[in-house]
């Protein structure tokens, strides 16, 4: 048993002493900052005990750790977080976990990353942290998590690798599904306007122009002049629908709708929210695969009219 004070649950295929990084009865304890990461871990290591920090509707950009979160981080065999300044209020706590932590976004090749319009506290340029909206990036993340789990629990390294490969194949399948859905939208209507700027990777991969009423972080909203310029863009391109997301910023969306009306164009707000930085509470939006399909279906239904 680790000296971390784990509170593990039983599993049938592992004994308490078969890996240095297991709880007393053999079950890995994993702390994941987002539902996307937790879902990836569960697909790779379905017997692991996974605690997800930011639940449905939560915002990892602004989330601040609770006392319970900090206790669970200390107890975990592995802490999985996005990095790339996503968990902006928890950087020190997460990075200080040494070999027990991995910031999966930091493991991506730089050429896979998109720019972010902000800098860190020292003025260094950052990258867009919404990496799950690129299926190639997410496959890389799955491989990174699998490798790290294999280091912690070498007796099951091959199982993790096999599960990761199966999950990566599912991600390829969902990429094909999403592309087919987006292809049903007429090319001149492939504009996605949302309340949170989480879909730039999605747009790059699947062929959509992305606009949003905030910048990459949900804490950074557009000025009235920015809203006016975006409204003019919507009117000029005759974009029929704008989207809220599950972070819910209705004031900005409603302000944008009014500004579009002032430009002489009528735009609707979709009655279905897109899923941005957190999973949903129930199927199908409680998984990465489910959300990718749901978002694509929602976009195609609204923009393909």
Feature locations, PLM:
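Extracytoplasmic metal-acquisition and chelation regions
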Residues: 5-305
């Amino acid at each position: 048993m680790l000296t971390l004070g784990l509170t593990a649950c039983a599993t049938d295929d592992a004994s308490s002493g078969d890996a240095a990084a297991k709880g007393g009865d053999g079950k890995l304890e994993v702390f994941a900052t987002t539902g996307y990461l937790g879902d990836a871990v569960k697909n790779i290591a379905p017997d692991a005990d996974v605690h997800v920090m930011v639940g449905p509707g939560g915002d990892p950009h602004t989330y601040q750790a609770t006392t319970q979160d900090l206790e669970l981080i200390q107890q975990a065999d592995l802490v999985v977080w996005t990095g790339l300044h996503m968990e902006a209020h928890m950087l020190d706590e997460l990075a200080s976990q040494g070999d027990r932590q991995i910031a999966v976004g930091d493991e991506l090749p730089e050429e896979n990353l998109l720019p972010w319009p902000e800098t860190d506290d020292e003025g260094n340029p950052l990258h867009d942290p919404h990496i799950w909206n690129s299926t190639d990036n997410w496959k890389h993340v799955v491989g990174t998590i699998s490798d790290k789990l294999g280091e912690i629990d070498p007796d099951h390294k091959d199982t993790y690798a096999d599960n990761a490969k199966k999950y990566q194949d599912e991600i390829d399948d969902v990429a094909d599904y999403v592309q087919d859905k987006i292809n049903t939208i007429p090319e001149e209507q492939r504009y996605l306007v949302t309340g949170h700027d989480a879909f730039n990777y999605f747009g790059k991969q699947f062929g959509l122009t992305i606009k949003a009423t905030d910048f990459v972080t949900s804490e950074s909203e557009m000025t009235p002049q920015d809203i006016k310029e975006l409204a003019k863009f919507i009117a000029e391109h005759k974009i029929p629908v704008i989207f809220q997301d599950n972070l819910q910023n209705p004031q900005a969306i409603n302000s944008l709708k009014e500004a579009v009306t002032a430009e002489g164009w009528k735009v609707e707000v979709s009655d279905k929210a897109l899923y941005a930085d957190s999973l949903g509470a129930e199927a199908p939006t409680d998984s990465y695969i489910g959300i990718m399909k749901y978002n694509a279906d929602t976009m195609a239904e609204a923009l393909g009219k």
